[in-house]
Amino acid sequence: MIATLFLRSLLFSPPSLSLLVLHRRREGELCERRRITSPIIIIIIILIPDLRRMTMTMTMNVCTHVAEVCLLLILIVGIGSVCTQAKPVLPEGIEAVKVDMLPHEGFGTAEEVYSSGIADAVVGLRRAMHAQPGVMYDEYFASETSVSTLRLMGVSESNIKTGLGVTGVVAHIGAGSLESTMRADSSVRTITLRADMDALPIHEETDVPFKSTVDGVMHACGHDAHTAMLLGAAMLLKRHESELVAMNAAVRLFFQPAEEGGAGAKALVDAGAIDGTSAAVMLHVSPEDDVGTFATMRGRTNAACFTFHVIIKGVGAHGAAPHQSKDPIAAAGAIVTGIHQIVSRTIIPTDAAVISIGYINGGKAFNVIPDEVTLGGTIRLLDVSLFDSVWQTLTLRIAGIAEAYGCSAEVINRNGEKGLNSRGEEFTIYAFPPLVNDIGIIELGEEVATKMYGEGTVDRGDTPFMGCEGTVILPLYLGYMMNDEHC
């Protein structure tokens, strides 16, 4: 029941009105609805170990429905255009797209998605958010656009909660209300659909008409697609909300900030955003799998991630007199080499680990040896129990090398570090746990993908990805992740 509920909900939803969404097209270009050319979509279904009020059978049913809905919605992204009615200024060349939000009977289909205008809306939303990206905790455009779109489709103010984790948004569609379903005694069976919203500090060099208008910031990881897809799912759910109500079930929409290193999910979880839910479905994109395939993996799928910052202090001098310095640049070079040897020389080869340096900063003049150099990076582990030994080796090695060069070094674990966004609002950085997939749910996802798209569309992988999936929801549940290249 729950399964049906959730998956169904994803694909269809009710209100009794039309939704106008701004849509951007290149002149003379039509939206190729069947041509899907984007990154893989990771569907992560997570189940709480203690499923009160639910039998395992009910849980599997819910997951089945959720998976079916997500797989269908996946087809929409990557074809798209620009935008919704939100406060930020949108790029030029935008037209309105009408979405039929009238209640719809029966299980949703791809035909419904396209004929209702939802596909065009998702395309427009995705391109709009691509053109107006925001880095972690600065996702104001995506956040405000999501809220505006939810309101337009008929989600009441009482069922939308904003400002969670600075820019995070949580909304409710189905039986009960957002407030009532967050209570422990709620009888409404609720599932969470999650999308991340943040972009990366990367300069976009494409020539697409919806390229980033924010200098040095780009949606290079597909989170614009995730957010647009979640809004598309919301439209379907609203069209079929009466079915959810009849089943005493609901879907919670979880728009997460700061997946890229800021652990925005934790801020929402701490605010109670997933209280009362029994499962969560998450999407991610990646261009590595063949178009038209779904990649699955059992067990550990994504690594845990910890970030560190190093401050190396020495004594500056003129470039012509290096003997008068305690050169922090020379020390930094040796430290980077030493760090890169930690994995190959101190960790058992069968234990997957990656330590990478992401930045080095020091000096301002070509002829002056600086007093200080900073550098930082990430530690990625499939087995979190290795962290203490890796951290100890890292800190001791950095301190020893710095001392050998006459310098000192401070190594900072950034877990719990505070920061401010562009509007002066405070946020906190946290480490990410690994993602571990539940075999039973993975098998269910494979079954659904095969049923919907045919034999040969599921690629069962066995090599974990050392990238992390920044959602703190994961350590609370069993997990399921599927990659889909339909996007």
Residue ranges and their predicted role:
Residues M129, L193, H223, L268, ...:
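Divalent metal-coordination and catalytic microenvironments
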Residues K87-H219, A228-A249:
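Acidic/His- and Gly-rich active-site-bordering loop/insert found
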Residues V169, A199-I202, T206-M218, D224-A225, ...:
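Histidine/acidic-residue-rich, glycine-tolerant segments that coordinate divalent metal ions
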Residues R126, P133, L150, G154-V155, ...:
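Structural signal for hydrophobic packing residues in well-ordered secondary-structure cores
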Residues L75-E92:
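N-terminal signal peptide
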Residues K87-L102, S158, A330-C487:
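Metal-dependent amide/peptide-bond hydrolase catalytic core
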Residues M1-S9, S13, R24, C31-I40, ...:
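Classical eukaryotic N-terminal signal peptides for Sec-dependent ER targeting/secretion
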